[in-house]
Amino acid sequence: MIRLLGAALLLLGALLAGQALTGLLRRKRAVLRELRGFVEMMQAELLQRGTPLPELFARQADRRGLLWEPVRDCGRALARGVPADRAMEPLLETLKTGEALPEAAAAMGELSRALGKYDAGTQAERCKQICARLEEQEKQLWTTLTEKGRLYRALSFSAGAVLALMLW
C-alpha cells in the first residue's frame, strides 16, 4: 500500500512539474502582452497628444505586478529629470532577470535610448517598431508554449509513470 501511495505521489509530482514549466511560459507571454500594450499606449499618446514621458509612466500607478513597479520608478526618475536611458534601467533589469525575457529587455533598451533624444514623432515611430518586435516575440513564445507545453506535460507524466511502475 505504501509503495502504491509513493508511486501515486511521484506521478502527481511529475505532473505538477510539467504544469509549473507550462505556467512559467504563460506568465512570460502575459508579461510580453502587457509590455506591448504599454508601448502601444505610449505610441498613441506621443502621436496624438504629445504627452510628456513622466506623465505616461505615472499613469501606470494603479497597475499591479512585477513589471509595473519598475515602470512607476521610471516615471518618478523621469519626473526628477533623469535621462530616459538611465531612468529605464530598473525596468530593463527586471525584464532580464525577474522575467527572464532578454529579447524584450533589448527592445526596451533601444526604446529607452530613443525616448530621450528625439522628437515625439520619432519616438512614436520607435514605439511602433518596438511593438512589432514584442509582438513577434509573443508569437514565438506562443509557439513555444504550445509545443513545449505539451512536451513538458507528456515527459513529466511519462517520467512519473516509469518511476511509479518501478516502485510498484
What do the PLM-derived regions correspond to, one by one?
Residues P52, P83-R86, E103, T122:
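Alpha-helix N-cap and coil->helix boundary residues
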Residues I2-A79:
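Juxtamembrane/interface alpha-helical elements of multi-pass membrane proteins
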